[in-house]
């Protein structure tokens, strides 16, 4: 088993070190991750400049690009052998509901969708690393079990882990994505020379976070697993759109 590990918090982040440590005695692991924090990079690719991989003292590969860049190169010639699966994380911070649209953690896993093994994205619901051992243990268990999992092609699992010690985790729930409310307005700032700028506000609170959602599961102390696919087609809208388009051309 060959696993490519990436993230969006950066190659020196504690989460990716914990994930590598949890998997390195189970599989042949390669780490390719951004040289700096790329949270919110989504599935962006760097197309305006060359990418320069650098191997660090611990063997991790640092790349001056996005999480998707890292996985794309890892699957297309940077590594001596093609990985069997991609594992992303462990992100310090939730990737719930609408977060998956922006998340570099989820995007890195999605870039591995063409492989035979199901890719997984792991996120811990905390900006602090105290409960990374919990997340690392759960990641190991799920990766070990992946060999007996058969899912439709191009399915990725988005895993969110409550910020709790392992003994307080109540179990695992399969969930759908909830939805967040609209984020607050950006914060306007002015530098000492009078130039205006803006800080993007934090994500909105859960607007659709009832039973069955990823929000509800983690708030109840359960690990949330949401299967994702790239197809965002809203089939239920076809009937209304057919009527709307009739006679336009």
UniProtKB/Swiss-Prot annotation:
The keyword Cytoplasm applies. It comes from the Bacteria. One of its GO terms (cellular component) is cytoplasm. The keyword Metal-binding applies. It holds the Pfam family SurE. Its EC number is 3.1.3.5. It is an enzyme of class 3 (hydrolase). It catalyses: a ribonucleoside 5'-phosphate + H2O = a ribonucleoside + phosphate. Binds 1 divalent metal cation per subunit. It is found in: Cytoplasm. This is 5'-nucleotidase SurE. It comes from Pseudomonas putida (strain ATCC 700007 / DSM 6899 / JCM 31910 / BCRC 17059 / LMG 24140 / F1).
